[in-house]
Amino acid sequence: FSCIAGDCKDSCCLGWEIDIDEDSYEYYQTLPGEVGERLRKGMYETEDGGHGIRTNNCGRCIMLNDKNLCDLYIAAGEASLSEVCTDFPRFGIEYRNVEQKCLSLACEEVCRIFFSKTKPVKFVEQELFGDSDDDQGVTEEEAAFFEEVQRELIAILQDRTKPIGVRVDEYLDRANEYQKKLSQNDVEKHIDWISFNDFSFEHFDIRFGIINEMELLRQVWQDYMASGDYRENDIEQLLVYFTFRYIMNAIYDSNIMVYAYLSVMFTMIVRDMNATRFYKNGGSFTIEDQMEVARIFSKEVEHSEENVEAAKEEIIWG
Protein backbone atom coordinates (compact mmCIF):
# COMPACT_ATOMS: atom_id res chain seq x y z
CA PHE A 1 0.00 0.00 0.00
CA SER A 2 1.13 3.53 -0.81
CA CYS A 3 -0.94 6.66 -0.20
CA ILE A 4 -2.05 8.32 -3.45
CA ALA A 5 -2.24 11.71 -1.68
CA GLY A 6 -3.67 14.44 -3.92
CA ASP A 7 -5.10 11.90 -6.39
CA CYS A 8 -7.46 10.57 -3.71
CA LYS A 9 -11.11 11.46 -4.37
CA ASP A 10 -12.07 11.06 -0.70
CA SER A 11 -9.15 12.36 1.34
CA CYS A 12 -8.72 11.08 4.89
CA CYS A 13 -8.02 14.76 5.74
CA LEU A 14 -11.66 15.51 4.94
CA GLY A 15 -14.68 14.68 7.09
CA TRP A 16 -12.80 13.09 10.01
CA GLU A 17 -12.00 14.13 13.55
CA ILE A 18 -8.21 14.51 13.64
CA ASP A 19 -6.64 13.73 17.01
CA ILE A 20 -3.18 14.83 18.08
CA ASP A 21 -1.13 12.52 20.30
CA GLU A 22 0.77 14.05 23.21
CA ASP A 23 4.24 13.81 21.64
CA SER A 24 3.04 15.49 18.45
CA TYR A 25 1.27 18.18 20.46
CA GLU A 26 4.48 19.07 22.28
CA TYR A 27 6.40 19.10 18.99
CA TYR A 28 3.86 21.38 17.35
CA GLN A 29 4.34 23.93 20.13
CA THR A 30 7.88 24.49 18.85
CA LEU A 31 7.31 24.12 15.10
CA PRO A 32 8.66 27.29 13.45
CA GLY A 33 7.37 29.31 10.53
CA GLU A 34 3.97 30.08 9.06
CA VAL A 35 2.92 26.43 9.09
CA GLY A 36 3.71 26.11 12.79
CA GLU A 37 1.78 29.27 13.60
CA ARG A 38 -1.22 28.17 11.52
CA LEU A 39 -1.18 24.75 13.13
CA ARG A 40 -1.10 26.13 16.68
CA LYS A 41 -4.01 28.45 15.92
CA GLY A 42 -5.97 25.47 14.65
CA MET A 43 -5.39 23.16 17.60
CA TYR A 44 -8.03 22.74 20.29
CA GLU A 45 -8.63 20.73 23.46
CA THR A 46 -11.04 17.82 23.15
CA GLU A 47 -13.70 16.86 25.69
CA ASP A 48 -11.50 14.09 27.10
CA GLY A 49 -8.59 16.44 27.69
CA GLY A 50 -6.67 15.52 24.56
CA HIS A 51 -6.04 17.67 21.52
CA GLY A 52 -7.19 17.85 17.92
CA ILE A 53 -6.83 19.88 14.73
CA ARG A 54 -9.78 21.96 13.59
CA THR A 55 -11.50 21.53 10.25
CA ASN A 56 -13.08 24.29 8.18
CA ASN A 57 -16.76 24.68 7.35
CA CYS A 58 -16.39 22.08 4.60
CA GLY A 59 -14.87 19.54 6.99
CA ARG A 60 -11.36 19.91 5.55
CA CYS A 61 -8.35 19.82 7.87
CA ILE A 62 -6.89 23.32 8.08
CA MET A 63 -3.54 21.93 6.87
CA LEU A 64 -5.06 20.52 3.66
CA ASN A 65 -4.30 22.78 0.71
CA ASP A 66 -6.27 23.30 -2.51
CA LYS A 67 -4.32 20.46 -4.19
CA ASN A 68 -5.47 18.07 -1.44
CA LEU A 69 -1.93 17.86 -0.08
CA CYS A 70 -0.87 18.39 3.55
CA ASP A 71 1.05 21.62 4.13
CA LEU A 72 2.49 20.20 7.35
CA TYR A 73 3.88 17.19 5.47
CA ILE A 74 5.29 19.46 2.75
CA ALA A 75 6.97 21.77 5.27
CA ALA A 76 8.24 19.31 7.87
CA GLY A 77 8.06 15.79 6.40
CA GLU A 78 6.22 12.60 7.34
CA ALA A 79 7.84 12.46 10.79
CA SER A 80 5.93 15.62 11.72
CA LEU A 81 2.52 13.98 11.36
CA SER A 82 0.52 12.88 14.38
CA GLU A 83 0.02 9.16 15.03
CA VAL A 84 -3.50 9.08 13.60
CA CYS A 85 -2.31 10.61 10.33
CA THR A 86 0.72 8.31 10.12
CA ASP A 87 -1.17 5.13 10.97
CA PHE A 88 -4.26 5.52 8.80
CA PRO A 89 -5.47 3.43 7.00
CA ARG A 90 -3.70 0.86 9.16
CA PHE A 91 -5.35 -0.50 12.29
CA GLY A 92 -4.48 -3.34 14.61
CA ILE A 93 -4.80 -5.19 17.88
CA GLU A 94 -1.99 -6.00 20.30
CA TYR A 95 -1.70 -8.85 22.78
CA ARG A 96 1.36 -10.28 24.49
CA ASN A 97 4.24 -9.82 22.02
CA VAL A 98 2.00 -9.88 18.94
CA GLU A 99 0.51 -7.06 16.90
CA GLN A 100 -1.96 -7.89 14.14
CA LYS A 101 -2.33 -5.18 11.51
CA CYS A 102 -4.65 -4.69 8.57
CA LEU A 103 -5.60 -1.95 6.12
CA SER A 104 -8.99 -0.27 6.43
CA LEU A 105 -11.55 -0.26 3.63
CA ALA A 106 -12.32 3.36 4.55
CA CYS A 107 -9.41 4.23 2.23
CA GLU A 108 -10.25 4.20 -1.49
CA GLU A 109 -6.77 2.99 -2.49
CA VAL A 110 -7.07 0.07 -0.06
CA CYS A 111 -10.46 -0.74 -1.62
CA ARG A 112 -8.93 -0.67 -5.09
CA ILE A 113 -6.22 -3.13 -4.03
CA PHE A 114 -8.63 -5.29 -2.03
CA PHE A 115 -11.32 -5.76 -4.69
CA SER A 116 -8.89 -6.12 -7.59
CA LYS A 117 -7.66 -9.38 -6.05
CA THR A 118 -9.49 -12.57 -6.94
CA LYS A 119 -7.38 -15.06 -4.99
CA PRO A 120 -8.04 -15.71 -1.29
CA VAL A 121 -6.52 -13.20 1.12
CA LYS A 122 -3.20 -14.26 2.61
CA PHE A 123 -1.64 -13.04 5.84
CA VAL A 124 2.04 -12.32 6.28
CA GLU A 125 3.87 -13.05 9.53
CA GLN A 126 7.00 -11.09 10.34
CA GLU A 127 9.26 -11.32 13.38
CA LEU A 128 10.52 -8.00 14.69
CA PHE A 129 13.22 -7.75 17.31
CA GLY A 130 13.09 -5.35 20.21
CA ASP A 131 11.34 -4.81 23.50
CA SER A 132 7.72 -5.93 23.64
CA ASP A 133 4.93 -4.63 25.84
CA ASP A 134 3.69 -6.59 28.82
CA ASP A 135 1.35 -9.51 28.29
CA GLN A 136 -1.71 -7.26 28.86
CA GLY A 137 -3.30 -9.94 31.02
CA VAL A 138 -3.35 -12.53 28.23
CA THR A 139 -1.70 -15.90 28.82
CA GLU A 140 0.22 -17.78 26.15
CA GLU A 141 -2.48 -20.48 26.13
CA GLU A 142 -5.24 -17.91 25.62
CA ALA A 143 -3.39 -16.26 22.77
CA ALA A 144 -2.85 -19.62 21.06
CA PHE A 145 -6.54 -20.53 21.48
CA PHE A 146 -7.90 -17.35 19.92
CA GLU A 147 -5.35 -17.46 17.11
CA GLU A 148 -6.61 -20.98 16.33
CA VAL A 149 -10.18 -19.66 16.31
CA GLN A 150 -9.24 -16.92 13.87
CA ARG A 151 -7.29 -19.25 11.55
CA GLU A 152 -9.99 -21.92 11.51
CA LEU A 153 -12.86 -19.51 10.84
CA ILE A 154 -10.98 -17.82 8.00
CA ALA A 155 -10.09 -21.22 6.51
CA ILE A 156 -13.79 -22.15 6.47
CA LEU A 157 -14.67 -18.91 4.69
CA GLN A 158 -11.98 -19.45 2.06
CA ASP A 159 -13.05 -22.99 1.11
CA ARG A 160 -14.20 -22.23 -2.43
CA THR A 161 -15.34 -25.79 -3.08
CA LYS A 162 -18.58 -24.80 -1.27
CA PRO A 163 -21.17 -22.06 -1.90
CA ILE A 164 -20.76 -18.99 0.30
CA GLY A 165 -24.02 -19.67 2.16
CA VAL A 166 -22.81 -23.14 3.18
CA ARG A 167 -19.51 -21.66 4.31
CA VAL A 168 -21.27 -19.10 6.49
CA ASP A 169 -23.39 -21.86 8.07
CA GLU A 170 -20.23 -23.78 8.92
CA TYR A 171 -18.49 -20.60 10.07
CA LEU A 172 -21.22 -19.78 12.59
CA ASP A 173 -21.46 -23.40 13.73
CA ARG A 174 -17.72 -23.56 14.33
CA ALA A 175 -17.72 -20.23 16.14
CA ASN A 176 -20.46 -21.60 18.39
CA GLU A 177 -18.38 -24.71 19.10
CA TYR A 178 -15.44 -22.54 20.11
CA GLN A 179 -17.71 -20.40 22.29
CA LYS A 180 -18.99 -23.51 24.08
CA LYS A 181 -15.46 -24.80 24.54
CA LEU A 182 -14.52 -21.46 26.04
CA SER A 183 -17.50 -21.51 28.41
CA GLN A 184 -16.41 -24.93 29.66
CA ASN A 185 -13.17 -23.38 30.88
CA ASP A 186 -10.92 -25.06 28.32
CA VAL A 187 -9.34 -21.63 28.43
CA GLU A 188 -9.22 -20.20 31.92
CA LYS A 189 -11.10 -16.94 31.75
CA HIS A 190 -14.36 -15.73 33.25
CA ILE A 191 -16.93 -14.85 30.60
CA ASP A 192 -20.50 -13.68 30.46
CA TRP A 193 -22.09 -16.52 28.49
CA ILE A 194 -24.36 -15.45 25.70
CA SER A 195 -26.77 -18.05 24.39
CA PHE A 196 -27.43 -18.32 20.67
CA ASN A 197 -29.82 -20.98 19.43
CA ASP A 198 -30.21 -20.41 15.70
CA PHE A 199 -27.17 -20.34 13.45
CA SER A 200 -28.53 -20.92 9.97
CA PHE A 201 -27.54 -18.40 7.31
CA GLU A 202 -31.16 -18.22 6.17
CA HIS A 203 -32.52 -17.25 9.58
CA PHE A 204 -29.67 -14.84 10.15
CA ASP A 205 -30.56 -13.27 6.80
CA ILE A 206 -34.16 -12.82 7.89
CA ARG A 207 -33.23 -11.38 11.28
CA PHE A 208 -30.90 -8.68 10.05
CA GLY A 209 -31.94 -8.23 6.40
CA ILE A 210 -34.82 -5.77 6.54
CA ILE A 211 -35.04 -6.05 2.77
CA ASN A 212 -36.69 -9.46 3.16
CA GLU A 213 -39.79 -7.68 4.50
CA MET A 214 -39.94 -5.12 1.67
CA GLU A 215 -41.30 -6.39 -1.64
CA LEU A 216 -39.52 -3.98 -3.98
CA LEU A 217 -36.14 -4.25 -2.31
CA ARG A 218 -36.42 -8.02 -2.07
CA GLN A 219 -36.84 -8.16 -5.86
CA VAL A 220 -33.92 -5.76 -6.31
CA TRP A 221 -31.75 -8.00 -4.15
CA GLN A 222 -32.80 -11.12 -6.08
CA ASP A 223 -32.08 -9.40 -9.40
CA TYR A 224 -28.66 -8.33 -8.16
CA MET A 225 -27.81 -11.84 -6.93
CA ALA A 226 -28.86 -13.30 -10.30
CA SER A 227 -26.91 -10.77 -12.34
CA GLY A 228 -23.43 -11.24 -13.74
CA ASP A 229 -22.34 -8.28 -11.61
CA TYR A 230 -22.70 -10.22 -8.36
CA ARG A 231 -19.29 -11.56 -7.34
CA GLU A 232 -19.33 -14.20 -4.62
CA ASN A 233 -15.59 -13.78 -4.11
CA ASP A 234 -16.19 -10.18 -2.99
CA ILE A 235 -18.52 -11.47 -0.27
CA GLU A 236 -15.87 -13.97 0.82
CA GLN A 237 -13.20 -11.28 0.95
CA LEU A 238 -15.44 -9.06 3.06
CA LEU A 239 -16.23 -11.88 5.49
CA VAL A 240 -12.52 -12.61 5.86
CA TYR A 241 -11.73 -8.91 6.31
CA PHE A 242 -14.29 -8.43 9.08
CA THR A 243 -13.32 -11.70 10.75
CA PHE A 244 -9.65 -10.72 10.81
CA ARG A 245 -10.56 -7.30 12.11
CA TYR A 246 -12.94 -8.32 14.90
CA ILE A 247 -12.54 -11.94 16.06
CA MET A 248 -9.33 -11.36 18.03
CA ASN A 249 -11.17 -8.78 20.14
CA ALA A 250 -12.66 -11.81 21.88
CA ILE A 251 -9.29 -12.28 23.54
CA TYR A 252 -10.33 -9.47 25.88
CA ASP A 253 -14.07 -10.09 26.35
CA SER A 254 -14.42 -13.76 25.26
CA ASN A 255 -17.48 -13.11 23.07
CA ILE A 256 -16.49 -15.10 20.00
CA MET A 257 -20.07 -15.42 18.77
CA VAL A 258 -20.72 -11.69 18.98
CA TYR A 259 -17.79 -10.95 16.69
CA ALA A 260 -18.66 -13.82 14.34
CA TYR A 261 -22.21 -12.50 14.02
CA LEU A 262 -20.88 -8.95 13.64
CA SER A 263 -18.65 -10.04 10.75
CA VAL A 264 -21.57 -11.69 8.95
CA MET A 265 -23.95 -8.84 9.67
CA PHE A 266 -21.57 -6.18 8.37
CA THR A 267 -20.96 -8.21 5.22
CA MET A 268 -24.69 -8.54 4.66
CA ILE A 269 -25.23 -4.82 5.08
CA VAL A 270 -22.61 -4.14 2.41
CA ARG A 271 -24.25 -6.74 0.17
CA ASP A 272 -27.62 -5.05 0.63
CA MET A 273 -26.05 -1.67 -0.14
CA ASN A 274 -24.64 -3.28 -3.29
CA ALA A 275 -28.14 -4.35 -4.34
CA THR A 276 -29.45 -0.83 -3.77
CA ARG A 277 -26.64 0.63 -5.89
CA PHE A 278 -27.40 -2.00 -8.56
CA TYR A 279 -31.02 -0.78 -8.65
CA LYS A 280 -30.07 2.91 -8.77
CA ASN A 281 -27.63 2.18 -11.60
CA GLY A 282 -30.45 0.69 -13.66
CA GLY A 283 -29.28 -2.91 -13.33
CA SER A 284 -25.49 -2.69 -13.32
CA PHE A 285 -22.84 -2.83 -10.63
CA THR A 286 -19.13 -2.37 -11.34
CA ILE A 287 -16.04 -3.02 -9.26
CA GLU A 288 -15.83 0.77 -8.82
CA ASP A 289 -19.32 0.66 -7.30
CA GLN A 290 -18.18 -2.10 -4.94
CA MET A 291 -15.17 -0.05 -3.89
CA GLU A 292 -17.29 3.00 -3.13
CA VAL A 293 -19.99 1.08 -1.25
CA ALA A 294 -17.42 -0.69 0.94
CA ARG A 295 -15.55 2.56 1.58
CA ILE A 296 -18.72 4.39 2.62
CA PHE A 297 -19.74 1.57 4.97
CA SER A 298 -16.29 1.33 6.53
CA LYS A 299 -16.03 5.07 7.04
CA GLU A 300 -19.50 5.53 8.50
CA VAL A 301 -19.83 2.31 10.53
CA GLU A 302 -16.47 0.64 11.15
CA HIS A 303 -14.79 3.88 12.17
CA SER A 304 -17.57 4.91 14.52
CA GLU A 305 -17.27 3.29 17.94
CA GLU A 306 -20.89 4.24 18.63
CA ASN A 307 -22.14 2.44 15.52
CA VAL A 308 -20.08 -0.69 16.18
CA GLU A 309 -21.27 -0.82 19.80
CA ALA A 310 -24.87 -0.35 18.64
CA ALA A 311 -24.47 -3.29 16.26
CA LYS A 312 -23.03 -5.45 19.04
CA GLU A 313 -25.92 -4.50 21.32
CA GLU A 314 -28.38 -5.50 18.60
CA ILE A 315 -26.67 -8.88 18.33
CA ILE A 316 -26.61 -9.47 22.09
CA TRP A 317 -30.09 -8.26 22.93
CA GLY A 318 -31.76 -8.48 19.50
Where on the chain are the PLM-derived regions?
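Immediate flanking context of iron-sulfur cluster ligation sites
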Residues: 1-8, 42-82, 99
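Short, compositionally biased low-complexity segments
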Residues: 1-7, 120-125, 238-243
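Short runs of predominantly hydrophobic/aromatic residues within well-ordered alpha helices
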Residues: 5, 9, 146, 150, ...
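General secretory precursor processing signal
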Residues: 6, 11, 15-16, 64, ...
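A structured, charge-rich N-terminal accessory region that forms the first stable segment of a protein
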Residues: 10-45
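Internal, well-ordered alpha/beta segment that forms a basic, Gly-enriched binding/recognition surface
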Residues: 68, 75-169
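Hydrophobic, aromatic-lined core segments that form the binding pocket/scaffold
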Residues: 161-318
